[in-house]
From Swiss-Prot:
The keyword Transmembrane helix does not apply. Belongs to the aldo/keto reductase family. NADP(+) binds at residues 22-26, 52, 168-169, 192, 219-224, 273-283. This is Aldo-keto reductase family 1 member D1. GO terms for molecular function: 3-oxo-5-beta-steroid 4-dehydrogenase activity; aldose reductase (NADPH) activity; Delta4-3-oxosteroid 5beta-reductase activity; ketosteroid monooxygenase activity; steroid dehydrogenase activity. Signal peptide: none annotated.
Amino acid sequence: MNLSTANHHIPLNDGNSIPIIGLGTYSDPRPVPGKTFIAVKTAIDEGYRHIDGAYVYRNEHEVGEAIREKVAEGKVKREEIFYCGKLWSTDHDPEMVRPALERTLQTLKLDYIDLYIIEMPMAFKPGEEFYPKDENGRVIYHKSNLCATWEALEACKDAGLVKSLGVSNFNRRQLEVILNKPGLKYKPVTNQVECHPYFTQTKLLEVSASSMTSFIVAYSPLGTCRNPLWVNVSSPPLLKDELLTSLGKKYNKTQAQIVLRFDIQRGLVVIPKSTTPERIKENFQIFDFSLTKEEMKDIEALNKNVRFVEMLMWSDHPEYPFHDEY
């Protein structure tokens, strides 16, 4: 792949393409007003053309405002921006899928989005609350049919509301439920999962490559925040690894840049999140060097099968994806 800051798109299985690096806009626990707006504008100015967001992040209005401002300035055309939105777990019932996507479009004030993905295979009780809870404070689960949800997404694509469809946090079995669906119209183009040198997801990558189905989009490509609600805080911090530090010195790059370069050389799409302008710029500067085959093998050997984002609070959900090996 001959990728550059000016041209770093890779083809998807439906004829569309995706920029190999994007800006993640997840904010933990809640966004600081105005920060996402500035981050997205900074990213577009730097050369990013892929923005990853979600209605559940509570900042899609700022993402849309930033995109529209940059289009109005003439910095980019709308068709040059790739936006990925997500269907949340309370909207899995087929009749709720299109209204959820339309709500995202209204929030963004855009006519279409480029990719819409099922954020998690686990469904929660439908309603206004993102995390509906019972009297004991436990999230109320909901039985859904992933194939029926997918058919509703296919109808959204046919209606021109979205160009490509994908999934997130799906294991192999759940992905195959969609792929083996009778009458499948559109395959998922991506499966967005946690992936980094401590959790290389080699088997899931092999499944994607062998079936020529979906690209892996790596979230938390640099490790992640250390919020104990979501994250196993006993896991080792990735960016302090000695090998990454030594390679950074060799190439005059940061550990983060080494990791992101490793990921894109593996063919992964990466969506590092940041609201810090300097870091947003730094994360994009990965097209002016490449790692050797030996260095790639050395970084791959760092794998510890450490999953930072375990979502253990939902581990008793029937569709909890991480009981399976991959």
